């Protein structure tokens, strides 16, 4: 035991020491004088197991620890856990756990004097029991990893069989090496889910540009690798990564660089991760005091609650802390509220206020404190001084004490059951055996949480998200606003009560932290070489491409039947355009077609009615009727071009056009040949006369039609007309027209019609001066001249237009050429039949014939 005293003097570090001595020396000391100064980071506790009950008043002396708030929380957590265990009849029955520590400050000199006094004057201690069963030392510490390694190494050399070392601080990978530290156990988990929790939290607020400040240590580098891997999955970027060196001299030489990097960075969110007793803590406090306006994200071990004395610049954004989730410890607040000092009921309140307001405490007990008031309730202080809900380290202490109690329970009663009841000699066992039990131990703690002492069996951590609410300045409320659970689906792992957030001194607007402004709908991201994945420029989408989300890498091409709107964030279905009966142009052309066909029908009726008149007889009534009927169909052909095209109408358009016009032109050709033969034949040409009289000339018509039908058949065989959907010629429109199929075949049809028209024109032109009262040569000449002019003009105009205008040009050409033949050949005759009947007689025919002969 004197070796242990030497180690305490040498290390000058706080320990929580559990000494299983059943029973050893139990006594209670009175309070000593307070010393107004700051001390170490913890207190030394001796935890003993005795075979008698312990009253609750025993725990009141823990309130006399005059140290900073963090240690006070740990001491209260230790006292409460021991208090619960002692009240549990199923855990360590007939045994009680107690702790011994100095009534003065938690400094090693007073604790050492307590240990020395207890060991040297054990006979004078009350409740002394002489039977000593065995000993085992539990070292429960919260130090940085280097100090922990030093402590564990030294204690192991001196107390290898009596050391059971448990840490409740931050997990460090170096301490998880069981070969180097076989009897060291870490209560904290390795925080494998912390990186995912931070990334999910960042994504929840739409941030992608954050800064990171870590300690330049193995722990910091490991956390950086975890965090970088998670951030790369979701395209999040570091604005900067500051690795704060542990060496104070190296840090001081670069402190200004770290400060300028944070100040000049465009990010508003900075993550802090590292040891709280390192140079990183110095940096963080300095940045806070200088009023750097950033939103800080830390872990639970950082005490980021501002004190009421910190009336400096203040941070308008506040701080978030991630704490390991655990159920609420019921009864803890009531336990603390019912604890009072023996002599001075208000003394505990005064001490809490001293810790909160940084007041000066008088050297004597129960005196009025300078600049302080003791009239506040304990309940208020528990909320505003420090939250009495268990923090992460307090919860580790709670579970560590319970784990130790369970191990003692299992080992002790199993051992006693297996012992022979003989001479009652001392049965010694080492902490090595206890540790083998401890590593395998798992239990359900009183709040219902499953606790496993095996690191491999520990579940992924859930985290409570705490917001340090500092509005008004200095309030420093720790408010739980949500939690993170890795067991929920992606995107639903963070749950926040955002109505509890107050940004920028009361504002509800979430601060932004983006490397680049969002590329809104209608644009895409464009990165230059060397830019981070989160940094980009915005470029509008190309023509007929859209983006309906923010920050897309590539725009999406609209389908063939759709086009992009002016904002290029939505595809609009293109209007289907064709020459329809509903639009004015279609209505006009269809009416014009019907009117011409009706007029032609009237002309046909006139000729039929006056079929015995000389003017009708003189021009071959059969050919006249055939020509008028074909013209009726020529005028009706445009109706096939109007309306929604389909495969049938597309084929009928061209075939009907070609065949019907062939009938018309071949009839005109036959009439022209008839005129020529009638006036050019001489008496010796009996064969020609027979040919004219017999009507053999009429066979020209079917022969011409047959040739055109053969051309059309070849056309249909090679490449028939079909529906053509043109989605590119006009913006926002799908033009549906009939494609000609084989263009060569189409021009062959037109060419054949041109040959017939040109032949008729030539013969009629040569016969224009032949005698005869009703010579049609001149009429046919003019009609063919109109026909040829129309279709010669049609070709260039047809190729220069598209869509329904092109269809309208073809319809107009059909109507114009047909109207030319109707007007030039039949309108003058109708005028004569209806209005100049005096000229439609045999006498007038003889007069005209004789005059024509005389002139000739």
Curated annotation (Swiss-Prot):
Pfam families in the record: 7tm_3 (PF00003), ANF_receptor (PF01094), NCD3G (PF07562)
Tissue specificity annotation: Expressed in the vomeronasal organ.
GO cellular component terms, A-Z: plasma membrane
Signal peptide, first to last residue: 1-18
Membrane topology classification: Multi-pass membrane protein
Gene: Vmn2r116
Superkingdom: Eukaryota
The name this protein goes by in its record: Vomeronasal type-2 receptor 116
Keyword Magnesium: no
Residues that span the membrane, as ranges: 587-607, 623-643, 659-679, 691-711, 746-766, 779-799, 807-827
PROSITE patterns recorded: G_PROTEIN_RECEP_F3_3 (PS00981), G_PROTEIN_RECEP_F3_4 (PS50259)
Glycosylation sites: 94
CDD domains, per the entry: 7tmC_V2R_pheromone (cd15283), PBP1_pheromone_receptor (cd06365)
């Amino acid at each position: 035991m004197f070796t242990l005293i030497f180690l305490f003097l040498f290390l000058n570090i706080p320990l929580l020491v559990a000494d299983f001595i059943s029973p050893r020396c139990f006594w209670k000391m009175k309070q000593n004088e307070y010393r107004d100064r700051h001390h170490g980071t913890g207190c030394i506790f001796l935890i003993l197991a005795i075979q008698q009950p312990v009253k609750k008043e025993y725990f009141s002396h823990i309130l006399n620890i005059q140290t900073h708030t963090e240690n006070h929380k740990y001491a209260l957590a230790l006292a409460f856990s021991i208090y619960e265990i002692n009240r549990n009849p199923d855990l360590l029955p007939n045994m009680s756990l107690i702790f011994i520590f100095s009534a003065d400050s938690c400094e090693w000199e007073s604790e050492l004097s307590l240990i020395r006094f207890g060991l040297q004057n054990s006979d004078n201690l009350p409740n002394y029991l002489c039977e000593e069963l065995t000993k085992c030392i539990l070292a429960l510490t919260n130090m940085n990893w280097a100090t922990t390694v030093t402590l564990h190494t030294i204690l192991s050399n001196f107390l290898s069989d009596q050391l059971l070392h448990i840490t409740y601080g931050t997990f460090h990978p170096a301490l998880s090496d069981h070969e180097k530290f076989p009897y060291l156990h870490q209560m904290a988990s390795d925080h494998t889910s912390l990186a995912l929790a931070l990334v999910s939290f960042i994504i929840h607020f739409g941030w992608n540009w954050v800064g990171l400040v870590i300690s330049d240590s193995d722990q910091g580098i490991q956390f950086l690798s975890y965090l970088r891997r998670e951030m790369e999955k979701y395209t999040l970027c570091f604005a900067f990564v500051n690795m704060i060196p542990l060496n104070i001299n190296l840090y001081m030489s670069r402190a200004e660089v770290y400060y300028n990097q944070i100040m000049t960075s465009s990010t508003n969110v900075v993550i802090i991760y590292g040891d709280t007793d390192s140079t990183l803590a110095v940096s963080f406090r300095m940045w806070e005091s200088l009023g750097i306006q950033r939103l800080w994200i830390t872990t639970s071990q950082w005490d980021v609650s501002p004190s009421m004395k910190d009336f400096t610049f203040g941070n308008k954004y506040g701080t978030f802390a991630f704490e390991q989730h655990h159920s609420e410890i019921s009864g803890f607040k009531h336990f603390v509220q019912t604890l009072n000092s023996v002599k001075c009921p208000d003394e505990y309140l005064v001490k809490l206020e001293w810790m909160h307001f940084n007041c000066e405490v008088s050297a004597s007990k129960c005196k009025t404190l300078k600049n302080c008031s003791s009239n506040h309730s304990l309940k208020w202080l528990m909320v505003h001084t420090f939250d009495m809900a268990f923090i992460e380290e307090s919860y580790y202490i709670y579970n560590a004490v319970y784990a130790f109690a369970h191990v003692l329970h299992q080992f002790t009663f199993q051992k006693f059951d297996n012992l022979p009841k003989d001479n009652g000699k001392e049965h010694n066992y080492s902490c090595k055996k206890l540790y083998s039990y401890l590593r395998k131990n798992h239990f359900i703690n009183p709040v219902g949480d499953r606790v496993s002492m095996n690191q491999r069996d520990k579940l992924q951590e859930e985290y409570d998200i705490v917001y340090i609410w500092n509005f008004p300045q200095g309030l420093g409320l720790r408010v739980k606003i949500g939690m993170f659970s890795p067991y929920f689906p992606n995107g639903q792992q963070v749950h926040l009560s955002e109505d509890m957030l107050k940004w920028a001194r009361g504002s509800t607007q979430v601060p932004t932290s983006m490397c680049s402004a969002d590329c809104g709908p209608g644009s895409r991201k464009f990165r230059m070489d060397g830019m981070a994945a989160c940094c980009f420029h915005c470029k509008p989408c190309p023509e007929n491409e859209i983006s309906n989300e923010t920050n897309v890498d590539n725009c999406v091409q609209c389908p063939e039947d759709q086009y992009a709107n002016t904002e290029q964030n939505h595809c609009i279905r293109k209007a289907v355009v064709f020459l329809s009966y509903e639009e004015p142009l279609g209505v006009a052309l269809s009416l014009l077609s019907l009117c011409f066909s009706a007029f032609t029908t009237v002309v046909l009726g006139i000729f039929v009615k006056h079929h015995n008149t000389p003017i009708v007889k003189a021009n071959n009534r059969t050919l006249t009727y055939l020509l008028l009927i074909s013209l009726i169909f020529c005028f009706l052909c445009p109706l096939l071009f109007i309306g929604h095209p389909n495969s049938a109408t597309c084929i009928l358009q061209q075939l009907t056009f070609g065949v019907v016009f062939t009938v018309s032109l071949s009839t005109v050709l036959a009439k022209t040949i008839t005129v020529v033969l009638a006036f050019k034949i001489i008496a010796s040409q009996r064969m020609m006369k027979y040919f004219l009289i017999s009507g053999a000339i009429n066979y020209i018509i079917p022969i011409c039609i047959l040739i055109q039908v053969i051309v059309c058949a070849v056309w249909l065989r090679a490449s028939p007309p079909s529906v053509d959907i043109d989605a590119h010629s006009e913006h926002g429109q799908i033009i549906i027209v009939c494609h000609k199929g084989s263009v060569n075949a189409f021009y062959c049809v037109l060419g054949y019609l041109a040959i017939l028209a040109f032949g008729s024109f030539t013969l009629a032109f040569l016969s224009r001066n032949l005698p005869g009262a009703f010579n049609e040569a001149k009429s046919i000449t003019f009609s063919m001249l109109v026909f040829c002019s129309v279709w010669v003009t049609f070709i260039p105009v047809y190729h220069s237009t598209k869509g329904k205008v092109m269809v309208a040009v073809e319809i107009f050409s059909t109507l114009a050429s047909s109207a030319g033949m109707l007007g030039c050949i039949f309108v003058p005759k109708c005028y004569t039949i209806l209005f100049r009947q005096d000229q439609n007689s045999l006498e007038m025919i003889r007069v005209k014939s004789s005059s024509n002969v005389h002139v000739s």
